[in-house]
UniProtKB/Swiss-Prot annotation:
It is an enzyme of class 6 (ligase). HAMAP family: GatA. Disulfide bonds: none annotated. NCBIfam families: gatA (TIGR00132). Heterotrimer of A, B and C subunits. PROSITE patterns: AMIDASES. Keywords: ATP-binding, Ligase, Nucleotide-binding, Protein biosynthesis. This is Glutamyl-tRNA(Gln) amidotransferase subunit A. The active site is at K75, S150, S174.
Length: 495
């Protein structure tokens, strides 16, 4: 049962092959057995089974929605009533929220059953899930490798079939990169599609929640429940609700059923295929693009000339926003408080020094520096100007194509500990995802192969980038690929 997708599990529930309680018990046992992966920060069987019993009561009425009774894991950046909400940090290691994040509440209202809170890089700052106060997460495909970050716990949980789906957040690639490294599907929607209310903030102009699951079809179903306007989030977009599954299984153009993607133009940015891209990643992406051609799509060369500037721009803007957002954690209102201190100022210093990890401190320092007098204009304002140019580059590219494709990351997952001493090398791994986030565009990762040689068990993801509000079409394009291939069906050995 655990190998089934969300859609298949829903069919099993409808056919009464299992109950929501039995399904929850199955995944709780699997989570316990795979404890060494460290994918979860907190599991509470009593809370989970209470939700499952409520879901079964709904299922018995015969009028339950498409997600009722299905298990889901929540990234521990979403606050959840009744569970601890830690953001992977000592600072919040004992924090319990009095309310649910909008994303959590919407999925719970849709009848989904929470099986636990997943591990993550502290305050979502990281690309490897090694920055968590609760320890690193192992990649289920190769336990010597990182699962990606910051949503590494969610990615590992779905890959190891510890949950059929999970929530994630993406600030600069934190859904797409772990989805790629862990061989699952994940989508970052257009900025503002999914409410940030109750999502512990890292960089408010970049953070965006999204679903992670086995397939594009599963992600589309989840996005139906997650997306939508929320008056409690000032950046939430006022748009009509839409069905993100509406194009699944349909041809790109109605008259082209024989070639389902005939008429689709796929843009290939030359900047995504240059030096620095590993040969095995290039080979898997090229093979996926050939499959798209077989489905009828046309490949078009495009250019995103400011791609290389996305790293310095991101690492000015995101830390600047983080230094402001994280100033609230002072040991007074909430968060870790030092046991011994001389006065109020000393309490602030010691509480923050003890509560934050080294990567978070590094980014707070960078952010405070670029916002300081004399550097604000030189760094922060300059970065915001280039950010606008990056967004304009994408709009020029979309004049020639319908979607843009390329690798998610320059390499497959690296070994645990391999880049911990060199944060710049870690930052460079986000080269293909950062510009999408800076532009506020939707992007997703779809499994498309594996590395070579010693990396033969480490997955590769294909990145699909759409224009604003084009998620339904992106999911259609991803789903067509998954109907023609089985990469998304593959699971780690022993799972």
């Amino acid at each position: 049962m655990h190998e089934k997708s969300l859609t298949e599990l829903r069919a099993a529930l409808t056919a009464k092959e299992c109950s929501a309680v039995e399904l929850a018990q199955l995944y709780l046992k699997r989570i316990d057995a795979a404890n060494s992966l460290n994918a979860f920060i907190q599991v509470d069987p009593d809370l989970t089974l209470a939700q499952a019993k409520a879901a079964d009561a709904l299922l018995h009425t015969g009028h339950a929605g498409p997600l009722v009774g299905l298990p889901i894991a929540h990234k521990d950046v979403f606050v959840t009533k009744g569970w601890r909400s830690t953001a992977g940090s000592k600072m919040l290691s004992n924090y319990e929220s009095p309310f649910d994040a909008t994303v959590v509440a919407r999925l719970q209202n849709a009848g989904m059953v929470c099986v636990g809170k997943t591990n993550m890089d502290e305050f979502a700052m990281g690309s490897s899930n090694e920055n968590s106060y609760f320890g690193p997460v192992q990649n289920p495909w190769d336990v010597k490798a990182v699962p990606g970050g910051s949503s590494g716990g969610s990615a590992a949980a779905v890959a190891a079939r510890l949950a059929p789906a999970a929530t994630g957040t993406d600030t600069g690639g934190s859904i797409r990169q772990p989805a790629s490294f862990s061989g699952i599907t994940g989508i970052k929607p257009t900025y503002g599609r999914v409410s940030r209310y109750g999502m512990i903030a890292f960089a408010s102009s970049l953070d965006q929640g999204g679903p992670m699951a086995q397939s594009a079809a599963d992600c589309a179903t989840l996005l139906n429940a997650m997306a939508g306007f929320d008056e409690r989030d000032s950046t939430s977009l006022v748009r009509d609700d839409e069905d993100y599954t509406r194009y699944l299984g349909k041809p790109w153009k109605e008259e082209s059923a024989a070639k389902p993607l005939a008429g689709l133009r796929i843009g290939l940015p030359k900047e995504y295929f240059g030096a620095g891209l590993a040969d095995d990643v290039r080979a898997s992406v090229d093979a996926a693009l050939k499959q798209y051609e077989a489905l009828g799509a046309t490949l078009v060369d495009v250019s995103l000339p400011k791609t290389e500037l996305s790293i310095p721009v991101y690492y000015v803007i995101a830390p600047a926003e983080a230094s402001s957002n994280l100033s609230r954690f002072d040991g007074v209102r909430f968060g870790h408080r030092a046991a011994e201190y001389r006065d109020l100022l000393d309490m602030y210093k010691k509480s923050r020094a003890e509560g934050f990890g080294p990567e978070v401190k590094r980014r707070i320092l960078v952010g405070a520096y670029v916002l300081s007098h004399g550097y604000y204009d030189a760094y922060y304002l300059q970065a915001q100007k280039i950010r606008r140019i990056i967004a304009q580059d994408f709009q020029e590219a979309f004049k020639q194509c319908d979607v843009i494709m390329g690798p998610v990351a320059p390499s497959v997952a690296w070994d645990l500990g391999a880049k911990g001493d060199d944060p710049v090398q870690m930052y460079l791994a986000d080269i293909y995802t950062l510009s999408v986030s800076l532009a506020g565009l939707p992007g997703m990762s779809v499994p498309c192969g594996f590395g070579a040689g010693a990396n033969a068990q480490r997955p590769v993801g294909l990145q699909i980038i759409g224009n604003y509000f084009n998620e339904a079409r992106m999911l259609q394009v991803a789903d067509a690929f998954q109907r023609a291939t089985d990469w998304h069906r593959k699971a780690p050995a022993g799972v």
